Amino acid sequence: MKNQVIYQIFVRNYSKEGTFKKVEEDLFRIKDLGVDIIYLMPIHEIGVGQRKGTYGSPYAIKDYFSISPDLGTMDDFVSLVNKVHELGMKIILDMVFNHTSPDNVLIDTHPEYYFYKNGKRGNRVGDWTDIVDLDTNKEEVQDYLVSVLSFWCQKGVDGFRFDVASMIAFPVFLKARQALGNDVIFFGECIDHEFGNYLKNINSIYVADEELMKVFDCLYNYNWMHQMIAYLNKKGNLEDVIKAIKEDNPINIRVNCLENHDNSRFTSYFNDESSYREWVRFTYALNGYAFIYMGQEYGIKHKPELFEKDPVIWDKNEEMFNFYKQLNFKKHEQMDIKQDININDGLIFLNEKAFKL
């Protein structure tokens, strides 16, 4: 599976309509781009209680077995899945198992599934008003979450992207892998080392990358991504970026992400397109998966809002699209080899190929 291309879609803001049907209509273009795996952000019904914004966060889920009615019906979703498969691609769903909305259906049926602080449902870390944490240490919670995954596998999905996987009790993933088999894709959102150390210090759940990789196919590159963003914001140095990449590469298979729904558009860090393209080339040259957030393939600068209806404005820069298309083609031919990365005279050398970053 390595050296494939993942394409992230926020269905609500993918089009003016914000529906599965509009995504399905665009699948030929996505296939032409060279995408292997389509990753959908959460598609479930969103909680109303303490909702943020008009539409709410897709990560504040009311019912894991539901479809948000704004996006379409279950039949629409299954049609999308079938079309993805017909075109030779795979599709994975975002699963949010660390927390739910405060009015999730489990609140009434299984209040014991939740984490309590001072007698009240709450969060282990932070104080987010639109979510409450599940207690994933409990076996009954683990079994329930595995049943959620089984349900969506029966609908035809090929795997899952797990939100904040590092903060979910590891037996959830062990049980899921045992129940679903090795062919189901497990893509994990891990956390950077600094936040991981904080979680350990407060005795919260923290699963290290090395542990996650016992059952996961791939993890985000957040450790070096955050170093890169600091460098581009003139708050860090290139040596720290390279150090983080070297630390990641021997252990894990990374999804080399430059932008997503949590971060600014990568184009926003650059005044000239040539520097932007050089960073993209470098990222593609690294071992692991390539990652594109909807619109990135055109160099779009506007990042859709998470809590509102804010569709992508498809300003189609065909030259940029072809740039990504060519990189995706090369990615598929790329061989995994031990990567030698060094800095010399202001240039990054990756296996003797120079990048001016």
Indicate where each model-derived feature is located.
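Residue-level preference for long, well-ordered alpha-helices that form the structural scaffold
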Residues: 19, 69, 73, 137-141, ...
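Loop/helix patches that line or flank the sugar-binding groove of alpha-linked glycan CAZymes
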Residues: 1-2, 48, 52, 215, ...
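Active-site-proximal helices and loops of the catalytic beta/alpha 8
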Residues: 147, 163-249, 254, 282, ...
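Conserved residues at the C-terminal ends of beta-strands
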Residues: 12, 41, 67, 163, ...
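Substrate-binding/active-site clefts of carbohydrate-active enzymes
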Residues: 1-35, 43-155, 173-181, 185, ...
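Short acidic/polar active-site loop segments enriched in Thr and Asp
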Residues: 36-38, 158, 290
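Active-site-proximal loop/turn and secondary-structure-junction residues that shape catalytic pockets
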Residues: 44, 97-101, 166-168, 192, ...
